[in-house]
Every structure is written in C-alpha cells, then in structure tokens.
Amino acid sequence: MPERPPVAEDPFPQWVEALQRRHREALTFAEVRKGLQALSSLYVERRQKLAGGAALEGSGKRAAFALYYGPAHFLLVRAIVRQLGAASAPLRTIADLGCGTGAAGAAWALETGAAVEGIDRSGWAA
C-alpha cells in the first residue's frame, strides 16, 4: 500500500458539520440533548450498565456519542500524537481495536498519512 502524506488542511470542522447534518436529519436538538444527558448519566452514575451495551441503546444516545464524544476523542488523540511526536513514526496501518466511531484512529491516521483499520464488535460502530 503506498504511503499517503499527512492531511495539510484541518478536516475537523467539515467532519463535525457532516456529523451534525447526519444526526440532526433524523433527530431534533432536544432529542440529541436528552441522549447526551442519558449517556453522561450512564458514564457517571450507572457505569455497571455500560458492559451490557447500554451506552449505544437508542438513536439519541448513539447520536450524542457521535456528536460529542467522537469529536472529543478525535481532538484528544490528535493532541497526544502531536505532543509525543508520534506523527513522525513510520506507520503504514493503524489497527484501531474497539474503534467505536473511528474518531481516535482517524485522528492518528490523518496526522501520519497511515491507513486505518477499525475493528469493533458493535454493528453501529464506524
């Protein structure tokens, strides 16, 4: 597989806009907000339900995860890759195990020019 150069223009704003269009097409702002509140409650107050897949039950929680946690994970991983100088590591492929939305693997891959392979047990994942 040929190496690709890192992305020069920041794709983050366009990606977030596309996420908004995709998820707000089917749900209202209030439904996404309610999903984010329920998802946050799971993470903070009812963590025992996470192992059973409760975080991704329902379209509101899935949209909230994609719209809030996906971009947060993207920005966090991109900052880590930049701070560690990991973009200079010679990578061809990044295996993103438990990829979820794929945001973390995408952030690293965009910094390095590597391909990314996302693997997740959820059918909803990227």
For the regions a language model picked out, list residue spans one by one.
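Compositionally biased amphipathic helical and low-complexity segments enriched in hydrophobic
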Residues: 37-40, 92, 111
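Short, charge-rich binding segments
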Residues: 86-89, 108-109
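Conserved SAM-binding loop of SAM-dependent methyltransferases across substrates and taxa
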Residues: 101-113
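N-terminal auxiliary segments of SAM/dcSAM-dependent transferases
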Residues: 1-52
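Conserved SAM-binding motif I beta-strand of class I
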Residues: 115-120
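Conserved class I S-adenosyl-L-methionine
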Residues: 90-100
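Conserved short alpha-helix immediately C-terminal to the canonical SAM/SAH-binding motif I
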Residues: 124-125
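Conserved Class I S-adenosyl-L-methionine-dependent methyltransferase catalytic core
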Residues: 30-87
